[in-house]
């Protein structure tokens, strides 16, 4: 069985449709032991700065090895590749659009990788 993993969501999806629930369902199919916490699904639509401020204020309060999924992207569906960013303590998955810019400013140790298919 996969290891238990704490995963946070910071999105502009809102809570009036199926998108957040669908994402959680996919994660639980892959790892039924995952724990998912919503930091905020009410980031202003397509507002990268609002998303950046939200995750920057919250992530530091979570345990080491938490995976933070930050999905605020006015270019969704474009050719923009997602990023996998690791710091000394945290892991981030987000679009390459600046939504993690404040995390970059606060963390000294960063590894940034584009995720590609294959």
Identify what each model region corresponds to.
Residues 4-6, 30-32, 36, 46-53, ...:
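Active-site histidine-anchored catalytic micro-motif
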Residues 58:
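Short HxH-centered metal-ligating active-site micro-motif
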Residues 4-45:
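N-terminal glycine-rich anion-binding loop in soluble enzyme alpha/beta folds
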């Amino acid at each position: 069985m996969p290891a238990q993993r704490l995963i946070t969501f910071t999105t502009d999806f809102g809570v009036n449709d199926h998108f957040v629930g669908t994402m959680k369902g996919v994660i639980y199919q892959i790892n039924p032991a995952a724990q998912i916490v919503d930091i905020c699904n009410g980031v202003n639509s397509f507002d990268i700065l609002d998303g950046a401020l939200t995750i920057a204020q919250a992530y530091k309060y979570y345990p080491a090895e938490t995976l933070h999924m930050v999905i605020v992207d006015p270019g969704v569906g474009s050719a923009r590749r997602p990023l996998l960013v690791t710091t000394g303590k945290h892991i981030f998955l987000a679009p390459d659009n600046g939504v993690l810019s404040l995390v970059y400013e606060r963390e000294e140790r960063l590894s940034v990788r584009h995720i590609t298919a294959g």
